[in-house]
Amino acid sequence: MAGYDVVVVGGGHAGLEAAWAAAALGVRVALVTVNPDRIGMMPCNPAVGGPGKSQLVAEVVALGGLMGRAADAAAIHTRVLNRSKGPAVQSLRVQVDRDLYALKAQEILAERPVEVLRGEVAALWVEGGRLLGVRTVDGRTLPAKAVVVAGGTFLSGVVWYGRKSRPAGRQGEPPARFLSQSLKAVGHTLRRFKTGTPPRIRADSVDFGRLEVVPPEVPPGSFTGNPGPHAARLPTWQTRTTERTHRLILENLHLSPLYAGDIQGIGPRYCPSIEDKVVRFADKESHLLFVEPDGLSTTEVYLQGFSSSLPPELQEEMVRSLPGFERAVIQRYAYAVEYDSLDPTELTRGLQSRFLPGLFSAGQVNGTSGYEEAAAQGLLAGLNAARFALGLPEVHLPRESGYIGVLVDDLVGRGTDEPYRMMTSRVELRLLCRADNADERLTPLAVAWGLRPREDLERVEAKYRRVAAELRRLEALRVEGVSGLQWLRRPENTYRALAERFPPPEPLSPEEAYQVEVRAKYAGYIERQERLREKMRDLEAFRIPEGMDFPKVPGLSREAAEKLSRHRPKSLAEAARIPGVRDSDLTALAVHLRRGA
C-alpha cells in the first residue's frame, strides 16, 4: 500500500511548520485536519511576537520556517517592545489581520507538495511495537513512516462558559475524541492543562475617544526584512479595569469553573485569566488591557488581558465596567478550554517519543502555551520526522544555540507542570542569542539540514563579513583621541553619527549598522557570555553512557539518583539543569565519568 513518509496531525502553528519543514527534505507529507479551511487560524490574540517570542520567530525564520513570512504579509501594526532596554530583550510584536494571516500561511504551505486531508485521526496504527501510520474516524488507514502529533487544545478538549461545558477543541470546533487513548496505550503520561481567551467586542460599540491610542511604529518592523503593505496601517488602544470590574469578579467567583473546582487542568502562570489577576494581585487597583483590531475590515476588537471563563451574562457586565466600553456589545464570549497534554520529559531532544520510534509531537500537546512556541517545536519535529523517514539520525539544537534550544531543553530536561511560556529570562545567553543575529547563528544549520538553499548562507556570510570589516576599520580609526570603537562605546554616541563623519568605503544596510553598534557597545558583556557558553559546551562534552546505573554512583545523593534515573540525561550539562541535582552531585558524577564508568 502506497503511503506517506510523514503524516502531520493538526493544522495549527505547530502542524504548519512541521509539514513545511518535512516537505523541505523532499519526503511525501500529508497534513490531516478536521477543517482545512481553518489551517493557520489564530484562536487567541491576533499577534505574533513579544518578549521571548519574537526571538523564537526570528529563529524559525532563520531555520527556513514560515511563521515570520505569514506574520509580515498580514501585519497591520508593529512595535518594538523594551526599546529603552538593552538589545538582549528588545522584542518585535506584530499585530496581524487574523483572517489574512491564515490565508497567507495556507498560500505559503501550498508552495511545497503537502497533501492536505480532511479528517479526524482516531488512533496511531501500531503493530508489533512499530508505528505504521494513523487511522481516521471515518475508517481510513494512512500508512506513514513517521507521525507528528500537533493537536493543540483539541485532544479531549472541553470548553467552559461559566459552570457549563461542552466537548470542543476551541469555540465551534469538535475535539479530537480518541487520540489521547492511543497515546496512553503507547506508554505516554497525559495531564490536563487549561487555557483561555478573551471576548471579542463589536468595534462600533466602543467609544475609542475614551481609550489611550498606541500608534504603529514608522517605519514598521518585520521578522523577515520585508514589512507587509499594511504594517503601519492601524493603531491599537489601551484601557484599564475598574473597581466595579473587580467587585463583579470577586462577588461571582463561585460561578467560575476554575474556582468552583470544575476545571482540573492547570492554567498558564504568565497569561492568567482576569479572575486570577484580580484574586492573585488583590492590592492592584486596576489592570492594563490592550484593545486590538482583529483585522483591516473586521467589525471586532480583541480585549487582550481579559480572558475569562465566567458566564456570558456576567461577562456583559464586566466588559461594560471598562472605560470606553459602557455600551459594548460582545460578538463572541470569552471561554476556557481544558485539554490533554503529554509529559515532555518522555520525549527526546528531537521531540520524538521515547516509547515509539517515529512518533513525534509539537505544540500545546507538549505542554507549551503560545503560537511561537508551537511553531518552533513544529519545525524541529517535522524536520526530525522527515529525517527518521529517510533513515537519518535525529538532530537537535543545543541550549546555547538559542531560544529554541532553551525551549526544548527546558521541556525535555526539566518538564513542566503548567503551560510553558518562553521568556527572555529563561535564556542564559540572551545577549548572544538576540533576534537580530538569529540568521548568523542558525542559517548554517538550516542549510546543512536541507531547510534552506546554500545561496541563503552565502548572503548571510557576506553580511557578517561586511560587519566584521567595519569593526576592524573602526578599531583602526582615530576619533577624538581614541579608537572609533572606543568612541562608539560611549552611551551618547551612535554609529550613524560616526558614519556621517567618517563614512565607510561602502554604506552598510540598517541591519548591518545595527550589528556594528551592538557589537561595539556591548563588547565586554558579549565576551563574558562567550566564556559562559564555553563552560556550557565543556559540560555538554561530558557524555553520560546510555543505561548508567545512577544509584551506584559513589557520592550521589538519593534524590539526584532518582531524578537522573527518571530524566536519563545524556550529558553533564543536561544533568546540571535537572531540579534536585546539586553541585556536589555533579562533582560526584564527573569523578565517576573520569574514572571510565
UniProtKB/Swiss-Prot annotation:
Binding site for NAD(+): 267-281
Coarse class of the protein's main subcellular location: cytoplasm
HAMAP family, alphabetized: MnmG_GidA (MF_00129)
GO annotation, cellular component aspect: cytosol
GO biological process terms, semicolon-separated: tRNA methylation; tRNA wobble uridine modification
Native organism taxonomy: Bacteria, Thermotogati, Deinococcota, Deinococci, Thermales
Function: NAD-binding protein involved in the addition of a carboxymethylaminomethyl (cmnm) group at the wobble position (U34) of certain tRNAs, forming tRNA-cmnm(5)s(2)U34.
Subunit structure: Homodimer. Heterotetramer of two MnmE and two MnmG subunits.
Cofactor(s) the record lists: FAD
Intracellular or extracellular location(s): Cytoplasm
Record-level Gene Ontology MF annotations: flavin adenine dinucleotide binding
Listed name of the protein: tRNA uridine 5-carboxymethylaminomethyl modification enzyme MnmG
Residues binding FAD, per UniProt: G10, G11, G12, H13, A14, G15
Family, similarity comment: Belongs to the MnmG family.
Keywords: Cytoplasm, FAD, Flavoprotein, NAD, tRNA processing
Coiled-coil intervals: none
